[in-house]
Amino acid sequence: MSIEAIFDNDVGSIVAPAGCGKTQLITDTLVIKPNKPYLVLTHTTAGVAALKLRLKKLSVPTKNFFVTTIDGWALKLAKNFPASCPVLTSPENPRAFYPELRRSVLELLQNGNLNDILRASYSRLLVDEYQDCNFLQHQVVTELSSLIPTTVFGDPMQCIFNFAGRMPDWNSEVQARFPLIHELTVPWRWNNAGSHGLGLWVLDCRNILSQGNKIDLSTCPGYVHHKPLVGVVNTDLQSQQTTQYDIFNRAQNESLLVIGDSINARSRHKYAQSSRNIDVVEPVQLDSVANAARSFDGAQGIDLVDAILTYSGEMMTNVQRSQTLQRLRTIQAGRNRTPITSLESALFNVIQDSSRNNILAALQQLESKHGAKVYRKAAFAALKDTISLSSSMPDQTILDAASSIREQLRLRGDRRIPQRAIGSTLLLKGLECDHSLILNADNMNAQNLYVALSRAAKSVTVFSQSNFVGV
């Protein structure tokens, strides 16, 4: 379709199956010089980062657009108008905070006080991944669409953020407000990679799964590879990692996304911990960083060192918490027979002076320790950024700094999405790669399976007990 169809409709929707040119259509739209910036909203920081990267490659002037998450934009609005848009709940209680934020922003939009400001600020609103909007977010976008021209892009078969309250019905509520402009049907992701057959297969899977049927993984030889699970954890893990290394060896300079358990984040962390060159894609909430900050705020001396080692040990290998604590106690008692290392010196400084600068120095020494591998790079970088920021704001807590870092990432998008990484369908949706490795497709519903199958442009490897999948 041409972008003229977007500009010809003040409100409308485009149904966009995965890999069918939606992102290109959005970027082509943003290339057209506006008289005021475009507002582009999506759901994940990874999606924000991916879109910004595409726009940067196309040299689209940043003055043409403002890209962020829906909640990131809502938070920015609430902070700019705190008296008119009060949010009393702490962001550290996200289950209460974000619904309150959305309700408060919705009320602010409904009272009409910002109508002139919003019309003067943006020329058009584009909302990506619209199938993941809950009803409050849908109401917010609906209010905005009465002020500025609005196009929403989505695919009901990719609706996997449906666990946080009521979702608008796509036919009776979404398309009632945003009539269908066009449905994309050309599998550009795979055509551009020379994998036309895989693209047609993924589109066919979408139709089969949408009708409630299972798909047969043996029907796309050469592109889709089925690997059996035997139900023995260590045996299956060894098989999965052997397959991963085989992909690395045959595609040394190409990207790989490993799609793990959507519920059990620890299982994804353990996979990355025991694998070479696999990083972890983190949720935007960054709970582990907030928990570390909270722990650091409440500790001093050897207890603070213990907290530093504990949380670092959840993000990197070879921390050796118990051994290190015992060694520090030996040093503290003056019984050490071997010289103090630079890491031990940094940790001992924390015992003597629990300053934030000393905490940061200790984290940096842990990172450079021989044999250490940071397998959660985004989380560890955010933790260091948190401590660094907290050093410049001594009147506030480390947890306050963690909240600031998290909202910065939410607003601008996480730019540190690695080329070879593990995540869940929730975290990886909107991303694309050369190859994908699905660790267990047996318990995936139709939507999660379709999202998982449609990430890779060149090959898909699926572990499951049977070659027929799709609950």
Where are the language model's segments positioned?
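The feature marks helicase ATPase cores and/or their adjacent C-terminal helical subdomains
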Residues: 1-471
